[in-house]
Swiss-Prot record:
Superkingdom to which the source organism belongs: Eukaryota
Record protein name field: RNA annealing protein YRA2
Recorded name of the encoding gene: YRA2
Subcellular location: Nucleus
Alphabetical keyword list: DNA-binding, mRNA transport, Nucleus, RNA-binding, Transport
Domain RRM: 63-137
Listed Basic and acidic residues bias regions: 149-159
Subunit structure: Associates with mRNPs.
Residues annotated as signal peptide: none
Similarity comment: family membership: Belongs to the YRA1 family.
InterPro entries per UniProt: FoP_C (IPR025715), Nucleotide-bd_a/b_plait_sf (IPR012677), RBD_domain_sf (IPR035979), Yra2_RRM (IPR034396)
């Protein structure tokens, strides 16, 4: 029996393990990790976060049209030329994949989406038939949040300051009085020397 085993046997304590330092204070105080976490994130704290999350309006969905299986050698401009007879899209994005490309468009008038499917579904481009379908895409933010974020971005670019400034504001330069000329300095010195 080693000395450490003998000493630990007499005191009834567990042998100290270096790993305990990484486990946090709760394990060394005899509290289980679950007790510590339950106190930290109790039901009242969790419900506050849930309430705040539920209070936000759900993000809007956007009905968009998706062009799939576009060959890699078809440029964005060729797809734009296909749509030149239609009104200008509110949203357009092109995606490159390993073996093909895809494009997503959103129009203000949803009837144009059906027209896109009728006109371009099954169209052959550079030897491949493209697929056109309508789908709903979940927006990231509610309209008010998106509008505020874009407004903030525009204001910052235009030079408007938002929020409180960080740190001290720079002092404005005070206009210095004009430097006296040599004649003015000589006259001042003569007046001083003569006691006038």
């Amino acid at each position: 029996m080693s000395v450490d085993e003998h000493l630990n046997q007499g005191t009834g304590e567990k042998q100290y393990r270096r790993r305990d330092l990484r486990n946090g204070l709760a394990s060394r105080m005899g509290l289980g990790e679950s007790t510590y976490r339950a106190r930290e994130y109790g039901p009242s704290r969790r419900s506050r976060f849930r309430d705040r999350r539920d209070a936000r309006p759900p993000p809007p969905t956007h009905q968009r049209v998706r062009f799939l299986n576009i060959p890699l050698d078809v440029s964005d401009y060729e797809i734009d030329d296909l749509l030149k007879d239609l009104p200008k899209p509110l949203y357009s994005k092109f995606y490159d994949h390993e073996d093909s490309r895809s494009a997503v468009f959103e129009f203000e008038d949803h009837s144009i989406l059906d027209k896109c499917v009728e006109l371009y579904n099954g169209l052959e481009l550079h030897g491949a038939k493209i697929t056109v379908e309508i789908f709903e895409q979940q927006g990231r933010f509610a309209d008010s949040t998106r509008t505020n974020r874009s407004t903030d971005h525009v204001e910052k670019e235009a030079g408007f300051k938002t929020g409180r400034p960080r740190g001290k504001a720079r002092a404005t330069k005070k206009e210095k009085p004009p430097q006296p000329t040599l004649e003015d300095l000589d006259a001042e010195l003569d007046a001083y020397m003569n006691g006038n």
